[in-house]
């Protein structure tokens, strides 16, 4: 098995090549489509880099909140069921913090340049 380069490094290298070498010579609608493709590669690179740790942390928080073990999908379904039944709400200790952290982790992958996300990282967001 080949260890280097990692899938993340390969994706970043392709995205950088497209961004730096190909984008300057492409015009019009094809340039737009190229930027969409580069953005998709950047998103996949962030998913590979961040999601395993984010998912593990989310599952650990949910296990603590719900007092049960399971896959991330199972735990999220259990949380949704308990919310729907009125057993859990924003007054439940730890739930608001869990939801906030989960949102921040997802933004780090999906929209790291989102202005509100950046403000929160700088400590100027949520009071």
Language-model features: locations:
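Short alpha-helix boundary/capping elements
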Residues: 39-49, 70, 103-107
């Amino acid at each position: 098995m080949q260890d280097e380069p990692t899938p993340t490094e390969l994706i970043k290298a392709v995205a950088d090549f497209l961004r730096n070498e190909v984008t300057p010579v492409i015009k019009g609608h094809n340039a737009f489509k190229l930027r969409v493709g580069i953005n998709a590669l950047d998103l996949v690179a962030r998913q590979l880099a961040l999601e395993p740790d984010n998912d593990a942390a989310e599952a650990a928080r949910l296990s603590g909140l719900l007092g049960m073990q399971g896959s991330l999908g199972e735990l999220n379904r259990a949380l949704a069921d308990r919310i729907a039944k009125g057993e859990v709400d924003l007054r439940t200790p730890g739930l608001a913090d869990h939801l906030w952290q989960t949102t921040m982790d997802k933004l780090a992958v999906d929209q790291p340049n989102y202005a509100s996300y950046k403000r929160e990282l700088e400590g100027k967001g949520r009071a």
